[in-house]
Regions:
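Metal- and O2-centered redox machinery and metal/ROS homeostasis
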Residues: 1-222
């Protein structure tokens, strides 16, 4: 029970990792008219989660099972595939904050040493891989790590939509509840793809994320 409570704590939106500052292309998608209805937003969310399963989760899964040597290679591979500058910077910022928090929460997990090694080797401390490795070292099971990451991805998108005024809080939380029904089918496909075959499959999302810097007025950093 205590481990479950700790997992809920790590999934708390108030945890200061910086995720509240990023919309991952949602703000520009709304501004440029790519999304105008709730039906389109549902399709967008499904595509967003599919991309998380196809790209982030293979890295997270591999990181949770990695040793120091393979983790270094994994980090460099992830860094090479994250081509959108705003996403790249957001990942590094969140990774740094996340590792700092987990080092404080779980000093016995050896995360302080991991942080020093990343600095000494000048390795990019990306959020996704560090999320998987740090939670694994802290004693959490792989299925829980995968499910929590997908929950965070969904929660942050819906939170951004609410803050942008596209949907109301009640509608947003109803959508979040509805999407939990498809988590199992999405997660079933995670383990069949190694991180060397991970891919970003929704190009329009990447384009929207790249155009974010062109917004005249914006609430989010990406």
């Amino acid at each position: 029970m205590s481990q479950f409570a700790r997992l809920l704590h790590l999934a708390d939106s108030a945890l200061p990792t910086g995720s509240f500052a990023y919309s991952y292309g949602l703000e520009s998608s709304l501004t440029f008219g790519l999304l105008t209805t709730e039906t389109e937003f549902r399709a967008y969310l499904y595509s967003f989660l599919q991309q998380a399963v196809g790209f982030e989760l293979p890295f997270i899964t591999a990181a949770a099972q990695a040793n120091n040597i393979t983790f270094s290679t994994l980090l460099l591979e992830y860094d090479a595939q994250l081509l959108t500058p705003a996403l790249h910077q957001a990942s590094l910022t969140q990774g740094k904050n996340w590792l700092k928090l987990l080092t404080t929460f779980y000093p016995e997990a050896g995360l302080a040493e991991l942080g020093r090694e990343l600095t000494q080797q000048a390795l990019p401390a990306h959020f996704g891989p560090l999320f998987g490795l740090s939670l694994s070292k802290s004693g959490f099971a792989l299925p829980d790590i995968q499910a929590v990451y997908l929950h965070l991805a969904l929660r942050d998108q819906l939170s951004a939509a609410i803050r942008l005024g596209f949907i109301g809080p009640m509608a947003g939380h109803r959508l979040q509840h509805d999407f939990y029904e498809i988590f199992e089918s999405l997660l079933d496909s995670v383990d069949i793809r190694p991180y060397t075959e991970a891919s970003r499959c929704t190009l329009l999302l990447d384009v929207a994320q790249m155009f974010h810097d062109n917004l005249y007025s914006r609430l989010f950093q990406n």
